[in-house]
């Protein structure tokens, strides 16, 4: 990958390279850096203490970390020790989120509970249990994580539907779902923070990973 990307960048005469989830793009970043191309990471997820891909409190260095990091805001910029100087961490915000908030401001809230899945069995079970108990009072919607659509549909989707749970379409706009929903439940998805911007009350299942 490294030699191919280096050749590609050289031919295209790139000046800037934007990446998301930099720890999955290390060869690409290394190739860019070798040519003096400025590398910039856009925040995806929730950088926090204890997350090995972002927290370098130990003082260790990482040569393939991007030159600049554009965060969603000051909280994220200071939430952990990045392996770059503080002046290279820029609180850029989330313009796309703000645009969506305005786009869906006309939508009226429904008695809808959205489960923000990350493929954890406990959330699928939670969705089934809540739907069975409160099906006459609210709609339970299960928003799958993208990787739950990678291959054939998981077997537990059938169980969810049998319990009356609505499963979001793979192309559904999460922000529109938030705009319609009064409540959201999850464990450690960054989407939970985004849901708050739509006035969607947040509940976190107390299980492994919820501390993040």
Outline where the language-model segments fall.
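Active-site and donor-binding regions of nucleotide-sugar-utilizing enzymes
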Residues: 1-95
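Structural motif
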Residues: 19-23, 71-74, 115-120, 143-147, ...
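Anion (oxyanion) recognition and catalysis
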Residues: 33-34, 134-135, 161, 196
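Short, charged, surface-exposed secondary-structure boundary motifs
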Residues: 49-55, 99-104, 151-153, 177-178, ...
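Conserved catalytic-core segment of nucleotide-activated headgroup transferases in glycan assembly
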Residues: 90-159
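Nucleotide-activated donor-binding/catalytic signature segment of Leloir-type glycosyltransferases, i.e.
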Residues: 154-170
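A donor-sugar binding/catalytic signature common to diverse glycosyltransferases
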Residues: 171-212
């Amino acid at each position: 990958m490294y030699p191919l990307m280096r050749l590609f960048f050289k031919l295209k005469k790139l000046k800037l390279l934007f990446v998301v989830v930099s720890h999955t793009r290390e060869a690409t970043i290394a190739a860019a850096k070798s040519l003096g191309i400025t590398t910039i990471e856009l925040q995806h997820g929730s950088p926090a203490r204890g997350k090995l891909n972002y927290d370098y409190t130990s003082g260790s260095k990482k040569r393939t970390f991007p030159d600049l990091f554009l965060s969603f805001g000051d909280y994220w910029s200071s939430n952990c020790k990045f392996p770059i100087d503080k002046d290279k961490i820029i609180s850029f915000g989330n313009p796309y989120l703000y645009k969506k908030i305005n786009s869906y401001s006309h939508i009226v809230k429904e008695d809808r509970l959205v489960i923000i899945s990350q493929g954890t069995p406990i959330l699928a079970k939670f969705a089934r249990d809540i739907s069975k108990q409160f099906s006459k009072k609210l709609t339970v919607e299960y928003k799958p994580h993208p990787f739950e659509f990678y291959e054939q549909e998981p077997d537990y989707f059938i169980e969810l539907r049998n319990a009356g749970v609505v499963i979001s379409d793979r192309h559904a706009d999460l922000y529109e779902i938030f705009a319609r929903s009064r409540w959201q439940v999850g464990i450690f998805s960054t989407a939970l923070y985004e849901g708050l911007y739509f006035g969607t009350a947040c509940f976190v299942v107390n299980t492994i990973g919820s501390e993040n």
